[in-house]
């Protein structure tokens, strides 16, 4: 009987706890919608308070589990099924402390959450670079319970290949067939959220880590180290959470040799609470510490006056005169500042002198500071300003304990950081507009590239922010110059060559005429004429032989030719440079030249080397909108033979461009070009005879030559 009664009472307690949990906030509706980029949005509606969930992702089977603390479920249907390529089913269950939504997926996915009004939006999409995971008999997930059992029974956690919901890098969802457990690196991630107490909560998931982390504090940094837990470089990340208005400003997860290090950057006064929910899961809560405010403000209690009663009756009297009379009546020493001025009218009878002084102070907005038997009187605004300066100076001295941390510089040279105007504490004008305070100093250690700053915590924090802004890698630009030279050659020749040969025997006769004839009359009876057999135009001499009767042969040959040529030359120097840094590259020859100079009474001969190079000199400036401004000089020189009188000497043919231009990143800009064209026509002919209509074509030679040349200079810069 007692056992049954105990069970009934326990059941009532459980029901009461469930009712109280549900009253904190219930999930009333779940809706699913699609986005164009293959994303799904699961909209979870609440009736009261909204709880931002915490959860995890499993890849085998593909699930997303979300836990809502101190939340109940008020839904008629707690299992929702969908015919979708990504989302297959949503199951809702609850126990005494929380509610869980399990999103069953058809393929590995990832998620992100956002609070909008009385709803929590869950964005689901496929994991990047996912690979179907092989079966792993060593680790199995718990089978899904039926709908009715899930709604009533408490749920259990079975995590397989857990990855963080906010994955900064593209992580693979499964290992190879030989791997039976995921590596710790793929299960290491961080998440940040803000609770109702304005505290920053950092959740660290490192499932492959079995020990306890080492926690240390260095000024405003909390350093959590996981020994012998290696983090790949691709998973290193940094979260800027200053906009959440918590003591946490920045959270950084990085690799340090074989360890993983979590650095929490804080500000103000805070206290740390760390918890370990499960092996590999750690929660760090940074709470703002409440400060005890100094008592101050306006005292609303009624004033009491105990001074000797006096009577005053003045009309349009100086304030200083009234203060002098009150000083005599009270026996105190009153010192009024130069800014106390004006007149007033008083008519007081049997009033304590301290009450009269208080009335004057209120009427003229004066303030009193008493030190012993001396009272300082001044306008209230000036007195408040002076007091605030004194208070701030005391607070600065009280809270400005000097510290001297080491600030490592990773990219820039530490010698360049103090050259920044904000760090120059050598102010000769007296107007200190510097970052270092009057008692601060900066030391440089070039060996370790480290700054050692001695100053207050607030100044050190400003130093850290400034170094974060300055110690960044410089932007780089690949500058490429294309020098394109094209030449078209065209020539045409037309002419005729002809000739004749003949032989004749003559008996006791002489030739009628002869031109260019080798004639001879010897012992024989032969006469022989031998003109040149051919004549190629233009002919300087005409050859012809004749006789009264002869026989021979005529030669006639037509000469015609036409040539067409196209050449293209591409020169392509390229150089990589940093932003606002000059870069230079060149390739070519150094040609010796003999130079004669006059010195004294004679001449001296020296040999000088002149460059004939293909070169590029450029300075790039990247603008904030992505444009690139280039100051560029391009040279393309080539040696060639030149005629100097009757001699041939070596000279240099140059093509040069010097300009400044702006082009978008990845674009191509033609910054200049040269066009040359030489037209030549030649004609050689026989005088007089070549003008005859019958023989004009055969007694002249004509030629045409037209070789145009072009050179273009192109710049296609590309930011890396």
UniProtKB/Swiss-Prot annotation:
Classify the main location: membrane
Compartment(s) where it occurs, according to its Swiss-Prot or TrEMBL record: Cell outer membrane
Family matches, as InterPro entries: AMIN_dom, GspD/PilQ, NolW-like, NolW-like_sf, Pilus_4_PilQ, Secretin/TonB_short_N, T2SS/T3SS_dom, T2SS_GspD_CS
Q: Where is this region: Disordered?
A: 697-720
- Keyword presence, Signal: yes
Domain of life per record = Bacteria
Enumerate the Gene Ontology biological process terms. establishment of competence for transformation; protein secretion
Q: What residue stretch is flagged as signal peptide?
A: 1-24
Gene Ontology cellular component annotations, sorted alphabetically: cell outer membrane
For this UniProt record, the keywords arranged alphabetically read as follows: Cell outer membrane, Competence, Membrane, Protein transport, Signal, Transport
**Biological function:** Required for type IV pilus biogenesis and competence. Could function as a pore for exit of the pilus but also as a channel for entry of heme and antimicrobial agents and uptake of transforming DNA.
| Family recorded in the similarity comment | Belongs to the bacterial secretin family. PilQ subfamily.
This protein's assembly is summarised as: Homododecamer. Tetramer of trimer.
Protein name per its UniProtKB record: Type IV pilus biogenesis and competence protein PilQ
Query: What gene name is given for the protein in this entry?
Result: pilQ
């Amino acid at each position: 009987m007692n056992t049954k009664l105990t069970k009934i009472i326990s059941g009532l307690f459980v029901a009461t706890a469930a009712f109280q949990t549900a009253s904190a906030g219930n999930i009333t509706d779940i809706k699913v919608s699609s986005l164009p980029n293959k994303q799904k949005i699961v909209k979870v509606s609440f009736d009261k308070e909204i709880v931002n969930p915490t959860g995890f992702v499993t890849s085998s089977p593909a699930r997303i589990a979300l836990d809502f603390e101190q939340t109940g479920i008020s839904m008629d249907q707690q299992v929702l099924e969908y015919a979708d390529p990504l989302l297959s089913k949503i199951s809702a269950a609850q126990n005494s402390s929380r509610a869980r939504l399990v999103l069953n997926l058809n393929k590995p996915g990832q998620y992100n959450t956002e609070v909008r009004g009385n709803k929590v939006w869950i964005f689901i999409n496929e994991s990047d670079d996912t690979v179907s995971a092989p079966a792993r008999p060593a680790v199995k997930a718990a089978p899904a319970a039926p709908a009715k059992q899930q709604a009533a029974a408490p749920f259990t956690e079975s995590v397989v290949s857990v990855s963080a919901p906010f994955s900064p890098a593209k992580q693979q969802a499964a290992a190879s067939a030989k791997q039976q457990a995921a590596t710790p690196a793929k299960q290491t991630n961080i998440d940040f959220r803000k609770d109702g107490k304005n505290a920053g909560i950092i959740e660290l998931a490192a499932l492959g880590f079995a020990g306890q982390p080492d926690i240390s504090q260095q000024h405003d940094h909390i350093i959590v180290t996981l020994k012998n837990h290696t983090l790949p470089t691709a998973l290193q990340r940094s979260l800027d959470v200053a906009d959440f208005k918590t003591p946490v400003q920045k959270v950084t997860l990085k690799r340090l040799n074989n360890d993983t290090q979590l650095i929490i950057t804080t500000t103000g006064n805070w206290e740390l609470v760390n918890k370990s929910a499960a092996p590999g899961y750690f929660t760090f809560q940074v709470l703002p510490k409440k400060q005890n405010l100094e008592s101050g403000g306006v005292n609303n209690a009624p004033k009491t006056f105990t001074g000797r009663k006096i009577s005053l009756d003045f009309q349009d009297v100086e304030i200083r005169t009234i203060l002098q009379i009150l000083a005599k009546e009270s026996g105190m020493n009153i010192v009024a500042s130069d800014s106390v001025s004006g007149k007033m009218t008083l008519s007081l009878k049997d009033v304590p002198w301290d009450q009269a002084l208080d009335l004057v102070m209120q009427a003229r907005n004066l303030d009193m500071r008493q030190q012993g038997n001396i009272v300082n009187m001044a306008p209230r605004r000036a007195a408040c300003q002076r007091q605030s300066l004194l208070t701030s100076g005391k607070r600065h001295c009280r809270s400005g304990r000097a510290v001297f941390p080491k600030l490592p510089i990773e990219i820039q040279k530490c010698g360049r950081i103090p050259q920044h105007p904000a760090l120059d504490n050598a102010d000769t004008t007296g107007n200190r507009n510097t970052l270092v305070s009057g008692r601060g100093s900066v030391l440089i250690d070039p060996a370790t590239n480290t700054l050692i700053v001695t100053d207050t915590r607030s100044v050190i924090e400003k130093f850290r922010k400034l170094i974060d802004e300055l110690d960044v890698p410089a932007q780089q630009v690949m500058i490429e110059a294309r020098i394109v030279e094209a030449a078209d050659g065209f020539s045409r020749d037309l002419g005729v060559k002809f000739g004749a040969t003949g032989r004749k025997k003559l008996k006791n006769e002489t030739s009628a005429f002869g031109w260019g004839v080798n004639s001879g009359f010897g012992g024989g009876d032969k006469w022989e004429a031998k003109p040149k057999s051919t004549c190629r135009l233009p002919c300087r001499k005409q050859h012809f032989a004749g006789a009264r009767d002869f026989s021979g042969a005529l030669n006639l040959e037509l000469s015609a030719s036409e040539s067409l040529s196209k050449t293209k030359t591409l020169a392509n120097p390229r150089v990589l440079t940093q932003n606002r840094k000059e870069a230079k590259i060149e390739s070519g020859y150094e040609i010796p030249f003999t130079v004669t100079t006059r010195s004294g009474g004679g001449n001296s001969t020296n040999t000088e080397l002149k460059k004939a190079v293909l070169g590029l000199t450029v300075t790039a400036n990247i603008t904030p909108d992505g444009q690139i401004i280039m100051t560029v000089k391009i040279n393309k020189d080539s040696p060639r033979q030149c005629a100097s009188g009757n001699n041939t000497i070596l000279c240099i043919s140059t093509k040069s461009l010097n300009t400044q231009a702006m082009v978008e990143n990845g674009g191509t800009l033609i910054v200049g070009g040269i066009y040359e064209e030489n037209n030549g026509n030649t004609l050689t002919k026989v005088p007089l005879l070549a003008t005859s209509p019958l023989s004009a074509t055969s007694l002249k030679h004509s030629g045409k030559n037209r070789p145009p040349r072009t050179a273009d200079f192109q710049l296609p810069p590309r930011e890396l």
